[in-house]
């Protein structure tokens, strides 16, 4: 087979979520080396390293001929690479190989959840162009959330049960388990304002969160638009329905208790200040400014057969 690319760089963290990262590296390099004349394997020892390597690739200090990037890891590792590519304006395609708890965006790209299978899919995958979310000076592929979803992310980081991933089994006990905090919000979306009290606000680019599909048929990370959802205190009974369903459905069936507002530019303030979950990483607090950057990033995509 003819090599598609001159020089690929495969990034990974030692604590990627795979039980044996070195074995995992070996399993994916067979396929990746078949499409790259030269494949560099780059360990990221500390948070922020991948962003530094992206800067070196941009300035040609890393190598002069890098023309594709691969990442083996979970959503947090992928998020770091997205930030590196966007911050340093690297116009290079990215191949994502799942290696963590959740890889929500790989589902959007039709990539297999197993890293070895995913690497084999890279051989025939095509480059697709996708929107990116900008949050203050950070970037994300999939979602921005606060309230209940932050509490969930903190549970996962502590090694506790992943509430969102297990919602289908929890049902009506969600409210008791989580004891969610109400907060006041002021939201501006494309110059229209909204305010009130809520337990969770979610702005989504991709259709999968926590391993399940958001039941909104036309939600796409290629439409130049973001989708914001405001949950009210009566929403708990249908949270289960939303995250349990595996297929898209008519939003009108579950619209009670959830307000859905599409838009491109969003400003959000809360009282009190709230932590913000960006693709599973909690790194900001409100107030935040959010906008969609259309056609911002190139990702290897498996054709949906």
UniProtKB/Swiss-Prot annotation:
Sequence positions that bind Mg(2+): 220, 223, 225
Residue positions binding ATP: 44, 74-80, 101
UniProt enzyme class: transferase
InterPro entries per record: ATP-NAD_kinase_N, Diacylglycerol/lipid_kinase, Diacylglycerol_kinase_cat_dom, Lipid_Phosphate_FormReg, NAD/diacylglycerol_kinase_sf, YegS/DAGK_C
GO terms of molecular function: ATP binding; ATP-dependent diacylglycerol kinase activity; metal ion binding
Biological processes per GO annotation: phospholipid biosynthetic process
Location of the active site: 281 (proton acceptor)
Protein's UniProt name: Putative lipid kinase NWMN_0695
Organism this protein belongs to: Staphylococcus aureus (strain Newman)
